[in-house]
Amino acid sequence: MIGTGALRLASMYLLTAALSACTSLAPPANENSIWALQSQQLEKLTHWQLRGRVNVRYDNESQTPRIQWQHSDRAYRIRLWGTFNAGNTLIQGEPGRVSLDQGDKHFSANSPEELILQQLGYELPISYLEFWIKGLPVPDRPAALLFNDLNQLTSFEQADWTITLSDLRDYGGLTLPRRVDIMRSENDARLRFVGLSWTLPENQETAR
């Protein structure tokens, strides 16, 4: 059973896979339009829900709670829980405010990064997760992209983290991953989202 302390640790990190055998660092110029269209669609996707599991590893500690994430524009609601609903944790946020509730414990801060810094003493790019989970590098930030032979983005490096996308599925014409690995060698840090089931707006499809 996942303890409440472990789930609190996992939830803090949240407020922060092998690649295809045939890959290239960048597609030819005349094929860039495929990724350009996909990235534009992902940027416009600001309302979505997902369910799955997330394995959180940091400094040799590891936990795997279930996750339900509702995202509406820049506001989000993330629920984490373990076996038999143990350690039920709720994270809610919007620009300028974020809170975490677990039982009778309540924490709040101006940003998810600030909350992690207050509670754990770590600086992590948590605000990037809303982009990375969709398979989208944070716009206007340097990133090294890796594509497969279908010109699908399968991995990228950004802000000293490596993000690997796998089990790509079609959701009403939009490609989204069912697994996302986010890793950094420092502190042996890893977030592994698996079994993701996405629900998109009515003009998109729900896929599993």
Model segments located where?
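Gly/Pro-enriched, hydrophobic low-complexity segments
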Residues: 136-208
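Post-signal-peptide N-terminal segment of Sec-exported extracytoplasmic proteins
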Residues: 41-77
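Bacterial Sec signal peptide processing site at the extreme N-terminus
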Residues: 19-39
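Extended lipid/amphipathic-ligand handling interfaces
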Residues: 67-70, 91-93, 166-170
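Flexible, processing/modification-adjacent segments and terminal tails
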Residues: 102-159
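Beta-strand-dominated lipid-handling architectures at cellular/organellar boundaries
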Residues: 49-51, 70, 75, 90-92, ...
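An acidic-aromatic
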Residues: 75-123
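Sec-dependent bacterial lipoprotein signal peptides
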Residues: 1-22
